[in-house]
């Protein structure tokens, strides 16, 4: 790809992408456009601009974009309409951010006339797949530069040596009292990988967790909150309306105080290996419980069961980077259709790491107390009808057992 003219780099300003920026300049001699995304990760992003300028990047080629609203509204909330969990536990906080990064990189490439894009994901992880599937889905002819699959800087020590040689200003945060882990944060979650976590038999240190208090140290009194839903999406907490990204941030704050949303997981990566990561997803954990609570009274039984059947497939599509694939879009259409009547209010109890639904109410409820009651229902439900229903459902089993007995007599 020696004919590269201009590349859009997903740039954080950290060690890896700073080295990549310099390497791209030296290896390809191309013009670089940097893109830094604000996903509500809680970090100051302007230093990324200053670093890019130090590399000689033109001011008009430096993009620092606030994507918080779009991220939660168009990616997180649609995913939560499906009650999405990967391998029974993971709420896909990293996975769901990647398609938006890819989308914005392609938009910037079109805006600036760039012919290529680049990212800092390694050749061992899922993110390389997620980014590149997104690139090609949105811009089939785009060129993709992946330094980790080309260079020989395959260790942290080699990266640091390269940075020192080229005068790249990179802070080693763990030597300055920061975290020694590889972290990824956005409004949905924060993840931790690397160091002693690479041993699945080693317990995560309490000092690692940043968003949540230890459940043992959470308040001794439970907190009751209400979440209102409209068409499957949360719109208010305790009667106060929020924009999507503000609502998730508020749930993170509340959940973090009660030690909600910690996860220590060994997962199966798309590229074939198992990996261990720790995650904090306080707001998402609350939201998932609340959404299932409101669906329990507003969804038809077979529709709810169909959603549950499809959810693992939908989760795998997102985890594997197939957000833009036609099958994910088709599933989303079905999922969104099921949410039309998912309106109402759910009350939840938060206490020392746990979330419990304690009540749910909706104008669209399918729960009929007159039918469900243990008391006299006034003829709303004829219990005698159950006999025929049971016999018909038992018919195939009765036939099978009768046939078995005939065979046994021979």
Curated annotation (Swiss-Prot):
* Any one GO molecular-function label of the UniProt entry: argininosuccinate synthase activity
Example GO biological process: urea cycle
What sort of enzyme, by top EC class, is this?
ligase
Q: EC?
A: 6.3.4.5
Which reactions are catalysed by this chain?
A: L-citrulline + L-aspartate + ATP = 2-(N(omega)-L-arginino)succinate + AMP + diphosphate + H(+)
Pfam families in UniProt: Arginosuc_syn_C, Arginosuc_synth
One CC-aspect GO term? cytoplasm
InterPro entries for this protein: Arginosuc_syn_C, Arginosuc_syn_N, Arginosuc_synth, Arginosuc_synth_CS, Arginosuc_synth_type_1_subfam, AS_cat/multimer_dom_body, Rossmann-like_a/b/a_fold
The answer to whether keyword Nucleotide-binding applies is yes
User: Its pathway?
Assistant: Amino-acid biosynthesis; L-arginine biosynthesis; L-arginine from L-ornithine and carbamoyl phosphate: step 2/3
Q: How is this protein organized at the quaternary level?
A: Homotetramer.
NCBIfam families noted in UniProt? argG, PRK00509.1
Family statement drawn from the similarity comment of this UniProt entry: Belongs to the argininosuccinate synthase family. Type 1 subfamily.
Specify the protein name.
Argininosuccinate synthase
Recorded source organism is Polynucleobacter necessarius subsp. necessarius (strain STIR1)
Q: What is the lineage of its organism?
A: Bacteria, Pseudomonadati, Pseudomonadota, Betaproteobacteria, Burkholderiales
* Recorded name of the encoding gene: argG
């Amino acid at each position: 790809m020696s004919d590269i003219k201009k590349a859009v780099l997903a740039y954080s300003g950290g060690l890896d992408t700073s080295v990549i920026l310099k390497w791209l300049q030296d290896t390809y001699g191309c013009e670089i456009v940097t893109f830094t995304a604000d996903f509500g990760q809680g970090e100051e992003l302007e230093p990324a601009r200053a670093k890019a300028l130090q590399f000689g990047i033109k001011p008009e080629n430096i993009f620092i974009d606030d994507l918080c609203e779009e991220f939660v509204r168009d990616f997180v909330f649609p995913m939560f309409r499906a009650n999405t969990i990967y391998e029974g536990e993971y709420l896909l906080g990293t996975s769901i951010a990647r398609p938006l990064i890819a989308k914005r990189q392609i938009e910037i490439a079109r805006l600036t006339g760039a012919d290529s894009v680049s990212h800092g994901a390694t050749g061992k992880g899922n993110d390389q797949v997620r980014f590149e599937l997104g690139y090609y889905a949105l811009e089939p002819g785009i060129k993709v530069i992946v330094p980790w699959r080309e260079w020989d800087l395959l260790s942290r020590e080699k990266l640091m040596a390269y940075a020192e040689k080229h005068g790249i200003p990179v802070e080693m945060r763990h030597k300055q009292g920061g975290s020694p882990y590889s972290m990824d944060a956005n409004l949905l979650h924060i993840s931790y990988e690397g160091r002693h976590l690479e041993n699945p038999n080693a317990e995560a240190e309490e000092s690692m967790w940043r968003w949540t208090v230890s459940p043992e140290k959470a308040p001794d009194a439970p907190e009751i909150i209400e979440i209102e839903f409209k068409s499957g999406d949360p719109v208010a907490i305790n009667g106060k309306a929020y924009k999507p990204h503000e609502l998730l941030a508020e749930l993170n704050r509340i959940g973090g105080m009660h030690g909600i949303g910690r996860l220590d997981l060994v997962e199966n990566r798309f590229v074939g290996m198992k990996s261990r990561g720790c995650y904090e997803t306080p707001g998402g954990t609350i939201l998932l419980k609340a959404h299932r609570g409101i669906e329990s009274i507003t969804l038809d039984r077979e529709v709810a069961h169909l959603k549950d059947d499809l959810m693992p497939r939908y989760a795998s599509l997102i985890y594997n980077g197939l957000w833009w694939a036609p099958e994910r879009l088709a599933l989303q259409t079905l999922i969104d259709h099921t949410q039309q009547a998912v309106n109402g209010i759910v009350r939840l109890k938060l206490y020392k790491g746990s979330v419990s639904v304690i009540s749910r109410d909706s104008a669209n409820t399918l729960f009929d107390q007159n039918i469900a009651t243990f008391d006299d229902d006034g003829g709303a439900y004829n219990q005698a009808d159950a006999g025929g229903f049971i016999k018909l459902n038992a018919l195939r089993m009765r036939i099978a057992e009768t046939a078995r007995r005939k065979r046994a007599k021979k």
